[in-house]
Amino acid sequence: MEFTGGCVCGGTRYVLKSRPLALVDCHCIDCRRSAGAPYVQWGSVPREDVVMTKGEPRKIAYANRIRSFAACCGTHLFFEDAKDSDTIDFTIASLDDPTPFAPQKAIWLEDKLPWVVIDESLPSFHTTPKKV
């Protein structure tokens, strides 16, 4: 099964060759600030399962993390840990159809904005658990 996604203007497109391994709502301040949102929902897939089909994202490295944005319009697309080359995270909202991908965990609740309501049925973590 494949899943397609891309940026807001259509200049950058990708295909995921597998279902996400993890679906996480991240409330950390870095994700909030880079996305301009109260939190970001990430999916994780094996690196080899991400295929760019149009355009190439611009990568910005900071604090052992690499965030990738559409060079054409700035849409936040990917997140990589500089030390973990096995997986890559993608923004669920950048999928053409994000509806099947409900969150499985909430992380970095120590940075959560006070008015954000967390689904109490989700496993929640103060920071990042060992395996997300």
Model-derived segments and their meaning:
Residues M1-V132:
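A short Gly-Trp-Pro
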